[in-house]
UniProtKB/Swiss-Prot annotation:
GO biological process: translation
The UniProt record lists the keyword Transcription regulation: no
Superkingdom of this protein's organism: Bacteria
Protein name, per record: Large ribosomal subunit protein uL18
Pfam families membership: Ribosomal_L18p (PF00861)
Free-text function comment from the UniProt entry: This is one of the proteins that bind and probably mediate the attachment of the 5S RNA into the large ribosomal subunit, where it forms part of the central protuberance.
Higher taxonomy: Bacteria, Pseudomonadati, Pseudomonadota, Alphaproteobacteria, Hyphomicrobiales
Native source organism of the sequence: Rhodopseudomonas palustris (strain BisA53)
Family, similarity comment: Belongs to the universal ribosomal protein uL18 family.
GO molecular function: 5S rRNA binding; structural constituent of ribosome
Cellular component GO terms, alphabetical: cytosolic large ribosomal subunit
Length: 120
């Protein structure tokens, strides 16, 4: 494993362990970012179930003209995810940035989810 991969894996594990200590039973909003798309899901770790999910690959997102690799797509995914989570009865979550810096697309997704009804 290269040094960069080792560093990223350690950061991801450190963030994830800090979340587990402070979660106190709340579902986790997990984010994955690739170079072309962004994915987010609300996961109940106690039951091992995904409660809501959204990504820039969905048909409605592609029809809207979002490329998936920009801040506008991240905002749309955050808004859609929050709407689906609230519809399923989830209002409080723990934000799992997955080792990514809280900046750019990650921050845009988090802000859009907060504006649409999730609290974290």
């Amino acid at each position: 494993m290269s040094k960069a991969n080792t560093t990223n894996a350690r950061r991801k594990n450190r963030v994830r362990m800090a979340l587990r200590r402070t979660a106190s039973g709340r579902p986790r909003l997990s984010v994955f970012r690739s170079s072309k798309h962004i994915y987010a899901q609300v996961i109940d770790d106690l039951k091992g179930v995904t409660l809501a999910s959204a990504s820039s690959l969905e048909k409605t997102m592609r029809e809207a003209g979002n490329t998936g690799a920009d801040i506008d797509a991240a905002k749309a995914v955050g808004k859609l995810l929050a709407e689906r989570a609230v519809k399923n009865g989830v209002k409080e979550v723990v934000f799992d940035r997955g080792g990514y810096l809280y900046h750019g697309r990650i921050k845009a997704l988090a802000d859009a989810a907060r504006e649409s009804g999730l609290s974290f």
